[in-house]
Amino acid sequence: MNFVFWQSILEKYWGISSKLSLLDGEFDLNILVRSTDDEQYVLKIMREDCLQDFVDMQIQAINHLKSIELKLPFPNIIQTISGKEFIHCKDEFGNNRLLWLIKKLPGQKYVEFKRKNLNLVKELGRMIAKCDDALESFEHDFLNRSLKWNLIEAYWVEKHIDLIEDPSRKVIVQNIIKEYKNILPKLREQPFQAIHGDINDHNILVAGGLKDQPYISGILDFGDMCHCPRVCNLAIAAAYVVLDHDQPLSLIHI
């Protein structure tokens, strides 16, 4: 990656002089930006075929949450010098890209945090409830797209079940699919709204030193937002929070 090129882009559009390093990203490029005045940001360089509505949905959702002043730890959108929240730009190879910049939140990923406790789980539950309350009034056309990670559409996995070579694992998945089909009609009857849709252990940040009470310092990645039964947001988060716990069901009942 040509960091010098992206440094020039940040200087041109955001007026930020910086040092850059690459962060993790599934489809898009995420660059950690350390400015010369000791501020930290994340430059999000979207995949070449990224739809503008995809970025707009995320930005509008974050702005919506911020406008309600819940004091929840979501990143601030950093506007360009000209007041834009995202820009179209060619990369160093001449490919069209969508770019946007957010303020970096403190903390480390929940999956990497060693001092997990019940207070963190309770705090996360309260935070999800507040987030869901706020997103109940959020609307965007892109929320209604077809999305594999929308739990209402989860039946798509059935046609791929023969890819599972381990017979015992295949039976587990088959049983889950059967149970899913049984509850799907009732799930469709639940209240629908905009949800985050991907509050997993890589999208939750935790901060706090050895002597401090750890706390949820950030929720990231609004890219899997969708219009879905509200309860699905809590179910998704619970599925990840219980990982590596000896008594997972007792944990989500607190």
Regions found by a protein language model. Give the residues of each.
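Structured catalytic core of nucleotide-sugar glycosyltransferases
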Residues: P75-Q79, K84-W100, A154-I161, A194-G197, ...
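A cross-family kinase active-site recognition segment
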Residues: E112-S168, Q190
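An alpha-helical support segment within catalytic cores of ATP-dependent transferases
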Residues: N2-K12, E136-H140, Y155-G197, A207-P214
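Short secondary-structure junctions
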Residues: L10-S17, E69-P73, L187
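Active-site activation/catalytic loop segments of kinase-like enzymes and analogous catalytic loops
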Residues: R230-I252
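Active-site acidic catalytic loop and adjacent metal/ATP-binding pocket
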Residues: E26-T36, V42, I77, K181-C232
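ATP-binding pocket architecture of kinase catalytic cores
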Residues: T36-E139
